[in-house]
């Protein structure tokens, strides 16, 4: 390498070999010197190539060393990170001062420092935070999203609630940030972390939320037709004790705790219950001098209240009455309405596949006349099989008042028709002209004609022939199965026919012919309904009580002459409907 460097140094920078002193003196080296110069130039080129290769190799080596150094640094950082103690999560309680806060970690309450990078004003109770090995808060996160379910028993001041956890264990917990923004009520389901003592989230459950509908009904007594005596009886039972409580106390009378509305389906039991709540709200507002009426109508869907787990249905009933007492504590009337009451509170010991009623019935009895009195709470039950309800519920002191909702007679049917067939409806011009040109007279004539068509005991109105256990037979007419719901349906059918005539024929308005056709269609549609394995049970549901029915024959199909009337015999009683 040194010999190469010496040879390179002896070459002129311009690429020519410098001549030695003897060469200049004797006139040059000639051809031999030229060859020597060429050889030196070749050596120089080879040296430059080798130098470039060595330089490139040196660059690659330097790059490899840098990469190795970076990997070593990264590995060292990873080793240091793995060697650090674990960071802990805690629950924020409250800010205590400049840069400090109280937290709960693993059940321990501590006062720790907070990193300057975190704004204490943005932290809310119950929020998750991260602490380092020195137990300083270094990061903030969202709220806990899991926990045990607990039910609110009582709302306490200062952001606390009393909840019922598993096995009815009572516990006082704090409310986390999201729950502080909205009101809570008894019975709400919350997610609770028992370690930190916080409730984080309200969980909508399909328990009482779906079974209970809190509302102020918009149904008035004037909206109900054909039930004047029943409405008067229920107003005497409900409104008098509420409006004249001092007179009742003076005479030593207690208001009734409950009312049973019984009768065939579709005759207005639910409407009456809603009208009671509405009327009570108005009367209560008048007593207080308030302009806006307020009441609560808790509509209990009986069959959906049943639960396959032991004790759940009873707990729901307790929760319903607890909510009713809560709403009524301020003097606001509360109506608890049990629809289809026989599905929940049937006679104990009558169950076919279970004896769930043996515990549900006593639970209701304890709520009605237990230690806690029901103030401003009215229990109304509705049923079309009152014979299946446990007698202990129906005795005086519980459901004191029993009101039968009968099927409408001709006069009542006219009143019900007047609720749905009004002069403000579009009426056909010919019908109006026939009745003196006034809409009210036209409506009255339509109602009279329709009621006469429905209630006349003619052959075309014959519906069923029933045979009793004693051998007697009786012909039942369509009027014997009429109801307010059927009347509304007839009017709706007539209105649809009027709309179709307007679209197809261009003739606008309801006609009496539409009502007549609607009656025929409604009767025809109902001829297949008495189809049950037990005619006597079907007759009881439909409101026909008395001697046991063993045979039913429909008469409408047989009158047309195309096919015989359909017969229904009594078969072995399975206890269930098809």
Curated annotation (Swiss-Prot):
Stated family: Belongs to the AAA ATPase family.
Protein task: ATPase which is responsible for recognizing, binding, unfolding and translocation of pupylated proteins into the bacterial 20S proteasome core particle. May be essential for opening the gate of the 20S proteasome via an interaction with its C-terminus, thereby allowing substrate entry and access to the site of proteolysis. Thus, the C-termini of the proteasomal ATPase may function like a 'key in a lock' to induce gate opening and therefore regulate proteolysis.
Gene symbol of the encoding locus: arc
SUPFAM superfamilies attached to this UniProt entry: P-loop containing nucleoside triphosphate hydrolases
Binding residue positions for ATP: 266-271
Positions of the UniProt region annotated as Docks into pockets in the proteasome alpha-ring: 577-578
Protein name as it appears in the record: Proteasome-associated ATPase
PROSITE patterns, per database record: AAA
């Amino acid at each position: 390498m040194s010999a190469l460097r010496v040879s390179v140094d002896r070459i002129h920078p311009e690429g020519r070999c410098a001549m030695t002193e003897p060469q200049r003196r004797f006139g040059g080296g000639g051809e031999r010197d030229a060859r020597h110069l060429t050889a030196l130039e070749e050596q120089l080129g080879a040296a430059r190539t080798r130098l470039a290769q060595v330089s490139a190799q040196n660059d690659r080596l330097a790059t490899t060393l840098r990469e190795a150094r970076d990997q070593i640094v990264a590995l060292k950082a990873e080793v240091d990170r793995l060697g650090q103690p674990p960071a802990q999560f805690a629950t924020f309680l409250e800010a205590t001062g400049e840069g400090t806060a109280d937290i709960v970690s693993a059940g321990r309450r501590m006062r720790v420092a907070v990193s300057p990078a975190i704004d204490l004003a943005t932290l809310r109770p119950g929020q998750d935070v991260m602490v380092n090995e020195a137990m300083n808060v270094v990061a903030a996160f969202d709220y806990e999203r899991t926990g045990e379910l607990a039910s609110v028993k009582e709302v306490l001041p200062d952001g606390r609630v009393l909840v019922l956890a598993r096995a009815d264990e009572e516990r006082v917990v704090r409310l986390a940030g999201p729950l502080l923004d909205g009101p809570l009520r008894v019975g709400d389901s919350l997610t609770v972390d028992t370690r930190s003592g916080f409730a984080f989230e309200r969980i909508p459950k399909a328990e009482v939320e779906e079974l209970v509908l809190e509302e102020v009904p918009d149904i008035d007594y004037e909206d109900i037709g054909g039930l004047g005596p029943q409405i008067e009886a229920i107003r005497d039972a409900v409104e008098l004790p509420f409006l004249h409580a001092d007179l009742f106390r003076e005479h030593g009378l207690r208001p009734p705790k409950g009312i049973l509305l019984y009768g065939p389906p579709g005759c207005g039991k639910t409407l009456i219950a809603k009208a009671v709540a509405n009327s009570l709200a108005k009367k209560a507002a008048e007593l207080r001098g308030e302009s806006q009426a307020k009441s609560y109508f808790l509509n209990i869907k009986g069959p959906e209240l049943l639960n396959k787990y032991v004790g759940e249905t009873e707990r729901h009933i307790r929760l319903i009455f607890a909510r009713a007492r809560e709403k009524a504590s301020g003097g606001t009337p509360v109506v608890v309405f049990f629809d289809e009451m026989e599905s929940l509170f049937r006679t104990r010991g009558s169950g076919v596949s279970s004896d769930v009623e043996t515990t549900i019935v006593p639970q209701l009895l304890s709520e009605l006349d237990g230690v806690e009195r029901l103030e401003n709470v009215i229990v109304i039950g509705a049923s079309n099989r009152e014979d299946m309800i446990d007698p202990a519920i129906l005795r005086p002191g519980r459901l004191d008042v029993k009101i039968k909702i009968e099927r409408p007679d001709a006069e009542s049917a006219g009143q019900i028709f007047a609720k749905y067939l009004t002069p403000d409806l579009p009426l056909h011009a010919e019908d109006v002209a026939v009745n003196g040109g006034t809409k009210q007279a036209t409506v009255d004539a339509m109602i009279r004609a329709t009621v006469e068509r429905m209630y006349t005991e003619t052959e075309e109105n014959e519906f069923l022939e029933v045979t009793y256990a004693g051998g007697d037979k009786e012909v039942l007419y369509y009027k014997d199965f009429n109801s307010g719901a059927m009347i509304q349906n007839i009017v709706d059918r007539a209105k649809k026919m009027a709309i179709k005539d307007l679209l197809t024929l261009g003739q606008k308005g309801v006609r009496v012919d539409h009502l007549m056709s609607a009656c025929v269609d409604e009767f025809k549609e109902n001829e297949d309904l008495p189809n049950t394995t037990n005619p006597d049970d079907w007759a009881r549901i439909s409101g026909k009580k008395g001697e046991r029915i063993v045979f039913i024959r429909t008469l409408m199909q047989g009158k047309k002459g195309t096919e015989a009337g359909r017969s229904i015999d009594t078969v072995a009683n399975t206890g269930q409907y098809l």
